[in-house]
Amino acid sequence: MASLAMSVPSFAAQTIGDITYEDQLNKEKTTLKLNGAGLREILFVDVYAAGLYLPQKAATTEEVISMNGNKTVRLGLLRDVDAADFVDALNEGILDNTTEDERQALSTELQSLIAVMNKIGDVKKGDIVDFDYSQTHETSVTVNGKLIGEKIGGEALYRTVLKIWLGEKAIDSDLKKSLLKN
């Protein structure tokens, strides 16, 4: 007699270092699903955990970038990072994944994002930094739930932010795989 097994999706929190990523996240009256989570290491040092929350699961960068609705990249710091290093890492990820023309077209938005990042200052172990994209086509950055600076308009900016972790030259290829694991 044949047995029929049902495959039930596993929706469970993931813990990376001391940071727990719940299977769902509520943002602006929308429930986002954890697509994947992983670890960012630099020279064998755990720097942060990252989780990608989306309206629905996605397996490729293209799916994530083209998806409508709210999105969040959540970083959970596993060590203290000074402001300059945090901003430099953001800049590096953007430079590696955009052309000069793309950066020129987004120069005002990128300057606004860098200004927001500079307002954050040093981040401490245990801090949660969210890069949010809203249905109103705005990018915002929060630290421990507190909005830093102003929201920045434009869908193209958030696509650029996503490419830091999901682009062709993502800041960490293993982390990219983990975020797209779903």
Q: Which residues fall in each region the model found?
A:
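Bacterial N-terminal signal peptides
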Residues: 1-7
